[in-house]
């Protein structure tokens, strides 16, 4: 049975002890020191309370899936206040919480969230890391494993296309109203997008939907769903060039050097950075796209798939027009679209820049 699980995929355990010290207790096969540092920054073990049990993020070319579990040694009866001791493996008796981290090369939060959850249950019950390797080997060899009451994992039941559509594109349109056109424009032109939210759960739900606005590219690798403001992470972010990056640190709002548009989930506002305003002059095409997006909210029969197909069609029409605007260089014999050639056509204000950006984003200039 074919599986996307590889024996090179790492499984790592980070544990928080009774003294609030957080350490990497086990890893197979290995991770770099940089990746270890990034995971520590992103796990909620460093916080007093577990803010979100499951999160997904990206560093360099690796997707990071973190599932965090509390280890209770006793349970309080709500009715009479009596305390019942919980049987905990010896290896976990000084552990108050642990994060099981899967590092993979593909985006599929539902798949790896399920796998991490089941593995976490196995580790919490046994405290035995070798049992995690058994799970990994069974998926690699058979495409599935069953650990009874702790869960069953079947690799083939997780279609990545379902992960793409997990958040409704209509919900995102509803959230931002008319300002959604700025998000569409930024995605279409491959501009740098920063999304801010106080809550990581809200951040992850929204940011994963942004590639839906340019679904024809099917590129979820542009996402950096959760980034901290550490120098290491920001350096990696900048090196990618184009990204949709999520932050929960409000100081990111003042870092205009890192974004072309800022999507603030807390205020439900979208703002353009001062150095990028000339890239976001809206014309008749933008108004047409915006009308289509807003009209979809008024018709319950229009599905998310209908919206995505409609956007794909509008982009196809735009690209057909761009192909007709190509000019051939007499020296090289190559056809391309230049900003200069567009400006000679005396298009409406801002349209030349927009079309040139689209041409580059879609690879029309080679």
Swiss-Prot record:
Residue ranges of every copy of the cDENN domain listed in the record: 169-309
Entry's Gene Ontology BP terms: protein transport; regulation of early endosome to late endosome transport
Domain dDENN: from-to ranges: 311-366
Cross-referenced Pfam families: SPA
Changes seen on gene knockout: No visible phenotype.
Gene Ontology terms for molecular function: guanyl-nucleotide exchange factor activity; small GTPase binding
Membrane keyword on record: no
UniProt entry tagged with the keyword ATP-binding: no
GO CC terms in record: late endosome
Location in or out of the cell: Late endosome
Annotated uDENN domain residues: 1-147
Keyword annotations: Endosome, Guanine-nucleotide releasing factor
Main location: other
Ranges in coiled-coil conformation: none
Protein's job: Guanine nucleotide exchange factor (GEF) which may be involved in the regulation of homeostasis of late endocytic pathway, including endosomal positioning, maturation and secretion.
Family per similarity comment: Belongs to the DENND10 family.
Name the record gives this protein: DENN domain-containing protein 10
Organism: Dictyostelium discoideum (Social amoeba)
């Amino acid at each position: 049975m074919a599986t996307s699980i590889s024996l090179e995929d790492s499984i790592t355990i980070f544990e928080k002890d009774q003294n609030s010290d957080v350490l990497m207790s086990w890893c197979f096969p290995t991770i770099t020191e940089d990746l270890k540092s990034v995971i520590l920054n992103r796990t909620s073990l460093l916080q007093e309370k577990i803010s979100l049990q499951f999160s997904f993020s990206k560093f360099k070319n690796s997707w990071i899936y973190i599932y965090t579990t509390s280890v209770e040694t006793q349970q309080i009866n709500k009715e009479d206040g009596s305390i019942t001791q919980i049987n905990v493996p010896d290896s976990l008796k000084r552990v108050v919480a642990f994060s099981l981290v899967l590092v993979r090369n593909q985006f599929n939060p539902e798949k790896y969230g399920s796998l991490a959850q089941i593995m976490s249950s196995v580790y919490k019950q046994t405290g035995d890391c070798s049992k995690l390797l058994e799970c990994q080997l069974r998926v690699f060899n058979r495409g599935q494993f069953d650990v009874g009451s702790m869960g069953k994992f079947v690799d083939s039941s997780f279609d990545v296309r379902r992960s793409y559509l997990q958040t409704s594109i209509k919900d995102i349109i509803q959230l931002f109203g008319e300002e959604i056109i700025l998000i569409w424009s930024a995605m279409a032109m491959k501009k740098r997008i920063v999304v801010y939210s106080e809550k990581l759960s809200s951040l992850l739900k929204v940011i994963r939907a942004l590639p839906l606005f340019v679904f024809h590219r099917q590129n979820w690798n542009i996402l950096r769903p959760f980034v901290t403001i550490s120098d290491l992470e920001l350096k990696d972010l900048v090196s990618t060039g184009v990204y949709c990056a999520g932050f929960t640190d409000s100081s990111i709002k003042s870092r205009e050097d890192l974004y072309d548009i800022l999507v603030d989930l807390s205020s439900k506002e979208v703002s353009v950075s001062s150095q990028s305003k000339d890239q976001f002059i809206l014309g008749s095409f933008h108004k047409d796209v915006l009308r289509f997006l807003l009209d979809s909210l008024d018709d319950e029969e229009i599905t998310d798939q209908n919206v995505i197909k409609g956007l794909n069609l509008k982009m196809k029409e735009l690209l057909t027009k761009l192909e007709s605007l190509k000019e051939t260089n007499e020296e090289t014999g190559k056809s391309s679209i230049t900003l200069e050639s567009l400006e000679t056509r005396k298009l409406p204000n801002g349209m030349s820049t927009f079309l040139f950006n689209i041409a580059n984003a879609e690879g029309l200039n080679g």
